[in-house]
């Protein structure tokens, strides 16, 4: 019980603490940072690929990114669960 409460308190702290550490800060993301680094290293560089779909806003882009990550996690954990169930079935037989 004590271990569970300690772990729960740590999870809550990890969720709430970032709101107070850099309050009002801006998160630019890695794409913008990579673009600025490329421009600093090789200003003549021209991208060789254009996106197939450009989201209307940053919120929609974040939504699509989150959905992609969620779908990937669902597939991975489905496969892990399937393999675990198959292993248990084989152990019982």
UniProtKB/Swiss-Prot annotation:
Subcellular location: Cell inner membrane
Membrane-related topology note: Multi-pass membrane protein
Pathways per UniProt: Cofactor biosynthesis; adenosylcobalamin biosynthesis
A matching Pfam family: CbiN
GO molecular function: cobalt ion transmembrane transporter activity
Function of the molecule: Part of the energy-coupling factor (ECF) transporter complex CbiMNOQ involved in cobalt import. The complex confers cobalt uptake upon expression in E.coli; can also transport nickel with a very low affinity.
Family recorded in the similarity comment: Belongs to the CbiN family.
Protein name: Cobalt transport protein CbiN
Species of provenance: Salmonella typhimurium (strain LT2 / SGSC1412 / ATCC 700720)
